[in-house]
């Protein structure tokens, strides 16, 4: 599809008015859509839309890069890839069979005890919206180069990561938004497991190679302590293979049809721990030039599945960080979503610009 005219935010309108509301039919296809936008200012935007069942954030950015490479030079070296088995068939052996089932059961018991102990807050819908009527909408935010450098520097100083800081800000904002004002918030954080598969999967190979694990954060603690706790917890979950346990759950217990899926979706709706999510793929090395094309940014965002209400999709490229918030309209009204995004960004900027405190002062 081609769109001509409009200002520099025409891409946002296309996403909110067309691309997010119009689902991709996985049974009949096509499985990929593109929109080429030529703005009044002479700039061009390329939207690449792929369903999450076959692509994650890294995959869709890779596809966009390949698309532009072919557009700039149709005679370019052809891209080839092997036909890979499903991700669950590439799991390390210790996460399959009886051992894999035992690992999943152990993690499930641990997480149930954690949730029972802390009663963490979730994103509670302002209005009930039936699954069939749900529509995702987008709020775009970003950090400029100076803010990104400051964030990276302060994260290192406090012994955490950029992802830890971004996720802490989102969890704290969600706590402010919650009527109960809980001391703990449950938030999902995806883990990319391409490198751990057998054999490993390259970033340019199409597929979904992430699994979202739940983390419970004590948001009553100082900001940088929350960020470190996220980093530590996520690192430990990766070491224990919790992301593969989730793949085991999906492979062994996922419903085979919509009728069978209803009870599972109802459970996730009522009690699922990851209806708030922070998905960060980090720095994506998108080129600044492809042939005669000069590129200014590359970013991704996500529509929301049946178990989510508010999601932050994050990556950096071309010296900036892109923070795309998506939410379920009406369940999270627009004004509420704007407040959440504003609080999230404000919390982060306050933390990275605050005077440096010693570790002793933080305790």
Language-model regions: role of each:
Residues 1-14, 49-55, 91-103, 129-146, ...:
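Acyl-group handling in specialized metabolite and lipid biosynthesis
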Residues 1-58, 62-65, 69-73, 139:
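Acyl-thioester-dependent condensation/acyltransferase catalytic cores
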Residues 1-3, 82-95, 100-105, 154-169, ...:
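Short, charge-rich amphipathic segments
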Residues 8, 40-41, 124-130, 144-148, ...:
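Short amphipathic alpha-helical segments, especially helix-boundary/capping motifs
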Residues 8-32, 175-363:
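Acyl-thioester-dependent acyl-group transfer interface
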Residues 10, 54, 58, 62, ...:
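Non-catalytic, low-complexity flexible loops and terminal extensions
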Residues 15-16, 46-50, 59-71, 147-155, ...:
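Structural preference for long, well-ordered alpha-helical segments in enzyme cores
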Residues 28-47, 127-195, 320-324:
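Gly/Ser/Thr-rich phosphate-binding loops and adjoining beta-strand/alpha-helix segments
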């Amino acid at each position: 599809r081609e769109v001509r005219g409009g200002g520099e935010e025409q891409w946002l309108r296309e996403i909110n008015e067309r691309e997010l509301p119009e689902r991709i039919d996985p049974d009949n296809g096509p499985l990929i859509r593109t929109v080429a936008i030529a703005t009044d200012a002479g700039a061009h935007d390329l939207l690449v839309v792929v369903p999450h069942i076959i692509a994650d954030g890294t995959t869709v950015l890779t596809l966009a890069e390949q698309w532009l490479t072919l557009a700039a030079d149709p005679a370019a070296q052809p891209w080839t890839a092997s036909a890979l088995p499903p991700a669950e068939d590439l799991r390390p052996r210790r996460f399959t069979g009886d051992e894999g089932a035992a690992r999943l059961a152990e993690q499930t018991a641990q997480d149930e005890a954690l949730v029972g102990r802390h009663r963490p807050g979730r994103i509670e819908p302002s209005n009930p919206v039936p699954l069939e009527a749900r529509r995702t909408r987008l709020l775009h935010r970003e950090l400029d180069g100076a803010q990104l450098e400051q964030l990276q520097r302060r994260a290192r100083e406090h012994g955490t990561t950029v992802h830890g800081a971004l996720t802490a800000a989102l969890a704290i904002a969600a706590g402010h938004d919650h009527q109960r004002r809980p001391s703990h918030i449950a938030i999902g954080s995806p883990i990319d497991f391409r490198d751990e598969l057998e054999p490993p999967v390259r970033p340019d190979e199409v597929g979904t190679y992430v699994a979202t694990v739940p983390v419970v954060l004590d948001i009553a603690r100082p900001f940088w302590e929350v960020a470190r706790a996220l980093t530590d917890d996520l690192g430990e979950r990766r070491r224990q293979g919790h992301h593969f346990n989730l793949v085991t759950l999906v492979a062994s217990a996922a419903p085979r049809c919509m009728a069978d899926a209803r009870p599972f979706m109802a459970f996730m709706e009522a009690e699922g721990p990851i209806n708030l999510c922070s998905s960060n793929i980090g720095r994506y090395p998108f080129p600044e030039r492809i042939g005669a094309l000069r590129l200014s940014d590359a970013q991704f965002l996500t529509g929301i599945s049946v178990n989510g209400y508010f999601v932050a999709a994050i990556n950096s490229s071309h010296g900036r960080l892109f923070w795309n918030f998506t939410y379920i309209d009406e369940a999270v009204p627009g004004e509420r979503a704007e407040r959440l995004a504003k609080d999230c960004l404000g919390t982060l900027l306050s933390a990275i610009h605050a005077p440096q405190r010693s570790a002793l002062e933080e305790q």
